[in-house]
UniProtKB/Swiss-Prot annotation:
S-adenosyl-L-methionine binds at residues 84, 89, 136-137, 155. Specifically methylates the N7 position of a guanine in 16S rRNA. Belongs to the methyltransferase superfamily. RNA methyltransferase RsmG family. Keywords: Cytoplasm, Methyltransferase, rRNA processing, S-adenosyl-L-methionine, Transferase. This is Ribosomal RNA small subunit methyltransferase G. It comes from Prochlorococcus marinus (strain SARG / CCMP1375 / SS120). The lineage of its organism: Bacteria, Bacillati, Cyanobacteriota, Cyanophyceae, Synechococcales. GO terms for cellular component: cytosol.
Length: 253
């Protein structure tokens, strides 16, 4: 089997996992994203997962499978934020897959956001993708962003209680947040529930997927608000990470 035929078969399997298939334009944007990440990676260290199925499975599939609910209604207009976007993923993959969405990518590291801004420009997404260089704790307290998003996502940023404090304040009353996790167990669920009780949130669903080629099991935890998040969250810069809300004394420190 030629490499081209092998890749085509693997690509088909990826879309089968998602029960969704990109349009020719979207597929071209994914290919262009891979090219741009490769180019920028020669200048700064964005990600090692660029070539072959490191990109298509560990980046594109892993970015999109947790939002299969949204892929079913890809023409719906929604407002999305990707917290701790790093090299621009999962946010850019989601923005490409949901062509009527408006997406905000946020990271505190300037060299990464500078590269991501250029990638957004080259992809032709400037009209609906915004890149911010800022600490999440500060953005989450700004009126412009607080309680304004339909979907908040984060991948490989922090433990679940910390992620919840980052994500919940961004949500509209009807919004949901999706935490992309590798490890997930009963203890982490218990810790998350403690944090959500303070944030006025709840767990909606938990799903898992074993990535092809033995690339590991991934988990997607969807959470939402039961009422507006209390104004004191997220706390000051660095505090959510140092004193996560599953710690009973965290609010007093």
């Amino acid at each position: 089997m030629t490499n081209q035929k092998k890749f085509k078969r693997q690509e088909t399997q990826i879309w089968q996992h998602l029960q969704w298939e990109p349009s020719p334009q979207q597929l071209e944007q994914f290919n262009q994203l891979q090219y741009l990440l490769r180019e920028w990676n020669q200048k700064i260290n964005l990600t090692r997962l660029i070539e072959g199925n490191d990109f298509w499975i560990s980046q594109i599939l892993d970015s999109l499978w947790p939002i299969q609910d949204e892929l079913k209604f890809q023409d719906k207009q929604i407002n999305i934020i990707d917290v701790g976007t790093g090299c621009g993923l999962p946010g850019l993959a989601v923005a490409i897959a949901l062509p009527r969405s408006s997406t905000t990518l946020i990271d505190s590291i300037y060299r990464k956001t500078s590269a991501v801004k250029e990638i957004v420009k080259e992809l032709g997404l400037l009209s609906r993708v915004n890149v911010l260089t800022e600490r999440i704790e500060l953005t989450g307290q700004k009126k412009l962003h607080r309680h304004t998003f339909d979907l908040a996502i984060a991948r490989a940023v922090a433990k679940a209680p910390v992620l919840a404090e980052y994500l919940i304040p961004f949500l509209k009353p009807t919004g949901q947040a999706v935490m992309y996790k590798g490890k997930w167990n009963d203890l982490e669920k218990k810790e998350l529930l403690k944090a959500l009780s303070k944030l006025k949130g709840k767990i909606d669903t938990t799903k898992s997927l074993e990535l092809p080629e033995r690339r590991g099991i991934r988990h997607a935890i969807r959470i939402s608000s039961t009422m507006l998040c209390p104004g004191k969250y997220p706390r000051s810069v660095g505090i959510p990470l140092k004193r996560p809300l599953n710690n009973q004394t965290s609010d007093n420190l």
